[in-house]
Every structure is written in C-alpha cells, then in structure tokens.
C-alpha cells in the first residue's frame, strides 16, 4: 500500500458516535466530566469504533523486535545478543511486560522484524525484513524499500489481529540500541539538537552518552534527513522496530482499532505515522510520559497528554499495558453506572 493510498483510505473519527458517547456521559449519575481524561478516551474510542456501544474484551500487545547496526559504535551498555534472549523470553512469560500483561488481560505478539539472528519461538519469515540494520555512522541504516516493507508488516499485523477479534492494540519494542535510533529520528522530526533528546538509555556512562550524542550529530550532518519525509528519516538513522511500529499506528487508523502509545520509541513511531498521515493521530491513545529527555516533547508534538506519570523507561510496552486497566475502568463506568433518570436524581446541567 502506498502513502497516497493510506491517506485516501484512513478516515476521520465518527463524530455521530462521539456525540452519542458525550451525551451518555452527561446522563450518568455522577458529577459532570469528573472522570476527565478517561471520559475523553471513551468518547474517542466510540469515534474510532463508529459506535457508542462497544467493549474491550480482547487486547493485544505487538512487540517489534529488531537489532541496530549502530551498536558497533559503543552506544549501548550491552551487546545486541540481548535482543534475541529477551524476544525468546516474551514467549516464555518471563519478562516485565509478560507479568504486567497477565494482570491486564493482554495477549503478547512479539514480531521478529529485524533481529540479527532467527529466534525459533518468534521468527516468521514473512515478518522479517533484515538481520538488523546497517551502522548509520558508516552508511544509511536502511533503504526506503526496507522501511516500507517494515511499515507494511506492521499494518498487516493490525489487520490480522482485528480479524482475530482484538479490539485494542498496545505497542512495544525490544532492540538494543533503539534509544540511539529513536533519539536520532526525534532530533530530526522535532527540529531540536541531539543533546536535547538523547538520554542514557539502559544505563550509559557519561562518556557513553557523549559518544551516543556525537554519533547522532555526525549522522544527521552527513545524511541531512528530510524532516518532512519520515520514511527518509527512518531509512537514514532509524530502526526496523520503529518502522514496524509506525505501521502498527497506521494500521490502527486504517482498520479502526485504537492503538496505545508506550514510551520513547513508541512515541517516535507514533510521530512518524502522524507526520505521514495526519488524521491517523486521532486513533492513538497515550499511556505515560517516558523519563527519556524527549518523552514529553514527543507527546507535545502529538498534542497528547499522558494518563500516567510513573517515571518509567523500561520499554517492551510496559507503559501501554499499564494504562489499559485504567481505560477499562473508565469504560466500565460508562457502560455500567446508572443514569440520573434511573436513580431518580435531578440531572446536572452543563453550565456555561
């Protein structure tokens, strides 16, 4: 699917369903607008699903797993072999997000979109673009064709999950070196200096952080990625996990499934999708604000406000999964609480 086709096919939210949801909130026997952002999210999802009467019975977490050639430059504390180990652990219910997903009732779908090795429990030939990206300190990370292939894989994953009955998709990632690629992409898209959006990732020393910033600065200076063209930016300094998640966000908009943003890497992908197809942003739900330097900046660029502020930076989709029970609680009030009329209480008026 081409970008022009996506722009043509992705439609705005259904205003009629949203208005019906707003009217129902007003009828519920509680102080008006007292659930704040939860009410807004329920209304937004009504617009996404084109009905004010919906449920969230099946929730999925798509975890894009990929390796990054830039780790050769010493910008990470650990080697890229860790990516494959953690990806395999997703299938064994032995990672942080696995434990959280059990509580939240979320099913995990790790995708090997670009790990440096095959992981039998995860790798599917049709979902793998490459065995890691190239080292962008020496050459562009990917070709445009590879970026588009990854985006299309993300879109197809949403289509498959919707066909399986999933009603909400959370986004996650695993890839050593992906805070470097995400910082590079964020620097370009936000038009800010690399040092303003680059953090220590999974625990870099001060010297390591300086190296990370230097590598990003040099790559941006060398390749001059076009901030008006996210595919160009991703191909030069991005990662396959970011590209795959960009596809998940676009797929959510295309197939009308709400997609939950996680943290830093996920927010970068969301911004890529929003820059490619602006209306797609209406289908994104924020979770938390990452403690990475660019976390708040990215949400601001997306014009979104986080529901959680937990000072998290773990990745894997942990923040996205954490917010799902909160959203479900808001929906439960919307669906189950009595109205003013049934409670025989005089309805509150919307005062101006």
Residue ranges and their predicted role:
Residues 2-352:
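N-terminal loops that bind phosphate or other acidic moieties
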